[in-house]
């Protein structure tokens, strides 16, 4: 016996009944769907339809709003930045800007307003960083390592 000769035992897979092929077939005329009505039609399920009962999305009150002026900031942990510096993807001797972080692949997404530096991980070198924002713990960690952080968003808010 060869691989191309393998097949199921006779009767292992019952043939599916074809629908709508006469009364004698057992699945003729209405094809087991009963008589008329919504469920007899093609494409039965209607999302959110609860049989005439007021659907849950209309029973619950509306809440909140979407602020169209909200700005999203891409998070970046100092541990990730440190790994990139050690791997040679970011030059620690130069000032590290958001463009340098984007070029190194540390920041993704086109619609982010800037980068926010967060404190997870450790940083071992003195670096000079310019980002949109930084948490207090991240700022303390960078300054403890001998570096400095300049935030652009805070500077813009102070000027306004």
From Swiss-Prot:
GO terms for biological process: translation. The keyword RNA-binding applies. Residues 1-39 are annotated as: Disordered. GO terms for molecular function: rRNA binding; structural constituent of ribosome. Residues 1-11 have a biased composition (Basic and acidic residues). Part of the 50S ribosomal subunit. Pfam families: Ribosomal_L27A (PF00828). It comes from the Bacteria. This is Large ribosomal subunit protein uL15. Belongs to the universal ribosomal protein uL15 family. Residues 21-35 have a biased composition (Gly residues). The keyword Nucleotide-binding does not apply. Coiled coil: none annotated. The gene is rplO. Binds to the 23S rRNA. InterPro entries: Ribosomal_uL15 (IPR030878), Ribosomal_uL15/eL18 (IPR021131), Ribosomal_uL15/eL18_sf (IPR036227), Ribosomal_uL15_bac-type (IPR005749), Ribosomal_uL15_CS (IPR001196). It comes from Granulibacter bethesdensis (strain ATCC BAA-1260 / CGDNIH1). One of its GO terms (cellular component) is cytosolic large ribosomal subunit.
């Amino acid at each position: 016996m060869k691989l191309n000769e393998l097949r199921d035992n006779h009767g292992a897979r019952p043939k599916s009944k074809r629908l709508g092929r006469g009364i004698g077939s057992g699945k003729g005329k209405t094809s087991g769907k009963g008589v008329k009505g919504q469920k007899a039609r093609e494409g039965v399920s209607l999302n959110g339809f609860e049989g005439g009962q007021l659907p849950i999305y209309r029973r619950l009150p509306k809440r909140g709003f979407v602020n169209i002026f909200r700005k999203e900031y891409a998070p970046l942990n100092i541990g990730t930045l440190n790994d990139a510096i050690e791997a040679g993807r970011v030059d620690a001797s130069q000032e590290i800007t958001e463009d340098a972080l984007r070029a190194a692949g540390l920041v993704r997404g086109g619609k982010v307003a800037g980068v926010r530096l967060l404190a997870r991980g450790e940083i071992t070198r003195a670096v000079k960083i310019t980002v949109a924002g930084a948490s207090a713990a991240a700022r303390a960690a960078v300054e403890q390592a001998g570096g400095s952080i300049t935030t652009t968003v805070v500077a813009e808010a102070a000027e306004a």
